[in-house]
């Protein structure tokens, strides 16, 4: 809180909170003061409920760094306090604002700070260091601020701290203090302090995306290219800041970071300064401004040659060509300014300062906790004592405790891991032996009847590498360094040593996550072809978010028979903000989730009705399947064979020494019409209303073909993106179910606050009522979770992690296809014009990618080893798909009788889900693995059997309850021989 309702200042501990001076996404900065002794402070108030685990880690890192270091050019953290709802960082107050404001307004630092100016600076005296008329700062001031920044960076570098967010907004200014003046610095020059160490520990997906969207002007090109980068990225930022101080504007400017990178690359390391413009160019500019009636520009001021050389050496695109830190610290620009101020310096002050710079590196240990305090209102006469809030470990967010981190190493691979809640100094525990819960008994066959589906036992499935090595697009990093484009950030992990905060210079960022956010930003900023409000075809994903569409004239091609809806449509506000209303959100009766999702469990390769005789095919999936058939072999799948994803899980800090698997699913224990739940999710995935989703497929695709707003290439792309999104969705839901068995709280569950906020955004009351019941079921699970086996919980977390990684691979593949499509339509200097629908799809993919990434990080934090069941992720998916299909077959066999009033929606959604999961196995995706020929034939047999059952149900209930579409429509993906009378050419028509 910042102010009381009556406008009185508030008190936190020994500090009084005054007016607000800054604001961000997760924190507000207020001016304040300490009561005894009275001194001004800046109080950063962080709202705890807004912090994700990643942001909490960032805050923890910032606190740890600021507590461990003390330097005159780094903002001092005086105290850290917390209440039940806020965290308060009390820092030194820099009264003159930040460098960005100073460059822009070039104000008097004393006047800005509200202080009396020294006698030499009173009005009437000529400024000692006047600023250039055309912009920028006085060169002496520039050299001073650069020298101070270099001192701070040198101090941090000796302690293995890389700031990663150097920009003028994070360089705070104040009038010089006594210690600063004792070093010989002039009184007219501001003292600079580096602030905001939120990025110093590691760069998560959400913060990187925010940085890319907010302030890319000072980012190194290797970051903009999504490459592995080292500490030299800070040097590029220093060069950009130095250029802006000298000239008055950044060296490169653009509307978005994609265009910014293009301009940097076009510059070819040729940095031009205003004073280097030719006389002819200046004359043409003056004539142009005169014609427009604008005031003439002042002549550019000269820039010293040594400053130009330094800037050009810092702003080199390739890090290997960029000057080193040692060369930067010894550059003439810095050494000359040190020589300039040394004659006026006090020897004792210089000696103390140099000792500080050379001091032994500090051991930075994350804070083990922050003391609780009370917040009270400051009265004019008396103060009301605040009540100490209770310390609740059950409901409040966790304290900023030390989290162990580990790096992919031989010890991690052999099983010598560190316990999740222990620091690196504690003894490593031996690997656990996990219980084996998955059998490997499989037989082949392809019976089409539900009885056979129910009795069938699947054969062993084998996935073999189709190409050696690790693919470029893989989501997990391997051991090779020659492919920097394939690097990854270890989910929440970094090397932590006894005397090192980072341990290594290199910081691995998750390339694919950056690409997803980058492409989404590019499309959001690019021109889009927009239709009129009445004529624009709704987005495929927005239609999925909106539920079934009401019948309306012109909503489908004239040739399409009407689709009968047996229930009211689900209404969800059509919002382009994908973070709040996501496409593919679950229908009513869904299990709570961290984001509203719809179970669009169909895929382009599964049965679905169509309108107008049109079928949307997934060309990419077909090609992948054909490739699998060519490259596969009939070898069996040994139990101890580990997939590429499993082999490379060392990037997550996990070992592969465990054996066994996770808990059995609730679906295998009891299946009934009243309690059928996909994936056996304890918090409840009721299928009562799920048929509404399936019924909308024909309408959705019919409308997609009813307009000529998009060309064929984009329509094919959108269809492929939907298919990949659906595969990613079912795998993510499967992973959610594994976590929900053991963890009632986390990103895989929906908070009550999000539930209520979603209700106000347009979701029907029926959804809210069902979600309430789902939360009640979840509470039952949470009540029993305290008695679960921690070994089983760890195994389930590892399995969920592998499923999330597979889901991320499909989402990344969708982004890659979109990126190629956009690049093929771009021209130099002219961005591609994309449809609003494609932008909506990409925004949804971005939201889902970040969501699944956070879930994967959550799962990784709950496991330290990789059990055999998680290593064989293909087997996990196959087992569950067959289990879901069997449950549907049993339900159909026992209840589908004439006159029984049976609702087929449960079976339809279950069959669709199983089909999508099996289709994901036939699509190798990012792990560059191909199934053996026997496995492909076996899975294909299951897919055909499921398709036949789907078609039978659609034929039987085509005009009644649970209808998926109009009678006579052909399902997508069913082979011609699967249904008599349907030609292959018709089934494969675009």
Curated annotation (Swiss-Prot):
Biased composition (Low complexity): 529-554, 587-613, 772-784
GO terms under cellular component: autophagosome; cytoplasm; cytosol; phagophore assembly site; phagophore assembly site membrane
InterPro entries: Atg1-like, ATG1-like_MIT2, Atg1-like_tMIT, Kinase-like_dom_sf, Prot_kinase_dom, Protein_kinase_ATP_BS, Ser/Thr_kinase_AS
E.C. designation(s): 2.7.11.1
Signal peptide: none
Predominant localisation class: cytoplasm
One GO BP: regulation of autophagy
Disrupted gene: phenotype observed: Prevents vacuolar accumulation of autophagosomes and affects survival during carbon starvation.
Family matches, as Gene3D superfamilies: Phosphorylase Kinase, domain 1, Transferase(Phosphotransferase) domain 1
Superkingdom of the source species: Eukaryota
GO molecular function: ATP binding; protein serine kinase activity; protein serine/threonine kinase activity
Record-annotated disulphide pairs: none
Induction of its expression: Transcripts accumulate during carbon stress conditions.
Lipid bilayer topology: Peripheral membrane protein
Functional description taken from the UniProt entry: Serine/threonine protein kinase involved in the cytoplasm to vacuole transport (Cvt) and found to be essential in autophagy, where it is required for the formation of autophagosomes. Involved in the clearance of protein aggregates which cannot be efficiently cleared by the proteasome. Required for selective autophagic degradation of the nucleus (nucleophagy) as well as for mitophagy which contributes to regulate mitochondrial quantity and quality by eliminating the mitochondria to a basal level to fulfill cellular energy requirements and preventing excess ROS production.
Protein name: Serine/threonine-protein kinase ATG1
Organism: Mycosarcoma maydis
């Amino acid at each position: 809180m910042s102010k009381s309702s009556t406008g009185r200042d508030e008190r936190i501990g020994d500090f009084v909170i005054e007016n607000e001076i800054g604001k961000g996404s997760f924190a507000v900065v207020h001016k304040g003061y300490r009561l005894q002794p009275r001194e001004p402070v800046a109080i950063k108030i962080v709202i705890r409920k807004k912090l994700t685990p990643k942001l909490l880690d960032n805050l923890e890192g910032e606190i740890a760094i600021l507590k461990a270091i003390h330097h005159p050019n780094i903002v001092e953290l005086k105290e850290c306090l917390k209440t039940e709802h806020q965290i308060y960082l009390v820092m030194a107050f820099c009264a003159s604002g930040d460098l960005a404001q100073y460059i822009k307004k070039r104000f008097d630092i004393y006047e800005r700070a509200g202080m009396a100016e020294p006698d030499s600076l009173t009005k009437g005296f000529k400024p000692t260091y006047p600023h250039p008329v055309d912009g920028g700062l006085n060169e002496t001031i520039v050299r001073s601020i650069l020298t101070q920044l270099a001192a701070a960076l040198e101090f941090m570098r000796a302690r293995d701290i890389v700031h990663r967010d150097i920009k003028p907004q994070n360089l705070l200014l104040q009038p010089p203090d006594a210690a600063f003046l004792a070093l010989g610095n002039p009184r007219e020059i501001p003292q600079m302090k580096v602030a905001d160490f939120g990025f110093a520990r590691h760069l998560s997906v959400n913060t990187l995306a925010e940085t890319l969207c907010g302030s890319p002007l000072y980012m190194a090109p290797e970051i903009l290219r999504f490459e592995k980068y080292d500490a030299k990225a800070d040097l590029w930022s220093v060069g950009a800041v130095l250029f802006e101080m000298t000239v008055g504007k950044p060296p490169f400017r653009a509307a978005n970071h994609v265009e910014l990178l293009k301009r940097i690359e076009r510059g070819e390391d040729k940095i031009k300064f205003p004073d280097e413009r030719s006389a002819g160019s200046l004359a043409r500019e003056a004539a142009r401004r005169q014609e427009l009636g604008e005031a003439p520009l002042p002549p550019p001021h000269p820039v010293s040659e040594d400053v130009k050389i330094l800037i050009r050496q810092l702003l080199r695109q390739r890090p290997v060509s960029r000057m080193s830190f040692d060369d930067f610290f010894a550059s003439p620009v810095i050494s000359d300014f040190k020589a300039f101020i040394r004659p006026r310096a006090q020897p004792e002050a210089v000696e103390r300062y140099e000792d500080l710079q050379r001091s032994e590196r500090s051991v930075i240990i994350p804070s083990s906790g922050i003391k609780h305090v009370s917040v009270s209102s400051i009265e004019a006469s008396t103060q009301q004592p605040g009540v100490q809030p209770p310390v609740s470990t059950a409901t409040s967010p966790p304290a900023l405790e030390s989290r162990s981190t580990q790096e992919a190493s031989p010890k991690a691979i052999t099983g010598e891991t560190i316990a999740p809640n222990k620091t690196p100094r504690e003894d490593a525990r031996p690997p656990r032996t996990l219980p084996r819960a998955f059998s490997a008994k499989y037989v082949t066959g392809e019976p089409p009847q539900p009885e056979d589906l129910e009795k069938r036992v699947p054969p062993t499935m084998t996935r073999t590498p189709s190409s050696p090595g690790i693919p470029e697009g893989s989501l997990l990093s391997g051991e090779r360094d020659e492919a920097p484009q394939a690097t990854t950030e270890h989910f929440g992990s970094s090397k932590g040593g006894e005397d090192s905060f980072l341990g290594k210079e290199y910081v691995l960022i998750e390339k694919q996550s950056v690409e997803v956010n980058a492409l989404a930003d590019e499309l959001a900023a690019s021109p889009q072809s927009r239709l009129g409000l009445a004529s624009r075809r709704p987005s495929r994903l927005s239609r999925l978010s909106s539920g079934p569409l009401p019948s309306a004239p012109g909503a489908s091609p004239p040739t399409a028979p009407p689709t009968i809806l047996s229930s009211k449509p689900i209404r969800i506000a059509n919002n382009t903000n994908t973070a709040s209303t996501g496409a593919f959100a679950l229908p009513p009766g869904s299990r709570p989730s961290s984001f509203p999702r719809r179970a669009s469990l169909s895929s382009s390769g599964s049965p679905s009705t169509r309108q107008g005789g049109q079928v949307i095919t997934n060309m990419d999936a077909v090609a992948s399947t054909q490739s699998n058939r060519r490259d596969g072999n009939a070898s069996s799948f040994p139990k101890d064979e580990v997939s590429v994803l499993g082999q490379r899980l060392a990037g997550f800090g996990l070992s592969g020494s465990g054996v066994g698997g996770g808990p059995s699913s609730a679906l295998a224990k009891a299946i009934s019409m009243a309690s059928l739940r996909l994936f056996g999710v304890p918090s409840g995935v009721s299928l009562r209303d799920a048929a509404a989703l399936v019924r909308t497929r024909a309408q959705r695709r019919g409308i997609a073909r009813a307009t000529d707003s998009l060309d064929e290439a984009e329509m094919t792309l959108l269809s492929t993106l939907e298919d990949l999104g659906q595969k990613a969705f079912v795998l993510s839901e499967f992973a959610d179910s594994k976590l929900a068995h053991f963890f009632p709280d986390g990103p895989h569950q929906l908070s009550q606050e999000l539930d209520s906020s979603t209700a106000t955004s347009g979701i029907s009351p029926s959804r809210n009522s069902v979600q309430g019941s789902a939360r009640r079921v979840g509470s039952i699970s949470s009540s029993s979770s305290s008695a679960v086996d921690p070994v089983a919980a760890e195994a389930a977390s590892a399995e969920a992690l592998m499923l999330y990684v597979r889901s991320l691979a499909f989402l990344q593949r969708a982004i890659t296809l979109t990126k190629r499509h956009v690049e093929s339509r771009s021209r130099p200097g002219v961005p591609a014009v994309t449809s609003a629908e494609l932008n909506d799809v990409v925004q949804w993919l971005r939201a889902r990618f970040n969501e699944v990434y956070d879930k994967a990080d959550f799962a990784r934090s709950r496991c330290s080893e990789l059990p055999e069941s998680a290593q064989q992720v293909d087997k996990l998916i196959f087992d569950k798909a067959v289990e879901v299909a069997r449950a549907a077959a049993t339900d159909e066999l026992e209840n589908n009788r004439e006159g029984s009033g049976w609702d087929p929606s449960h079976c339809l959604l279950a069959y669709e889900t199983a089909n999508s999961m099996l289709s994901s196995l036939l699509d190798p995706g990012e792990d560059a693995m191909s199934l053996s020929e026997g496995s492909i034939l076996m899975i294909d047999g299951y897919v055909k059997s499921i398709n036949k059952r789907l078609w039978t149900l659609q034929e039987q209930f085509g005009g009644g309850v649970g209808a998926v579409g109009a009678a006579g429509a052909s399902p997508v993906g069913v082979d011609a021989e699967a249904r008599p009378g349907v030609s292959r050419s018709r089934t494969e028509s675009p």
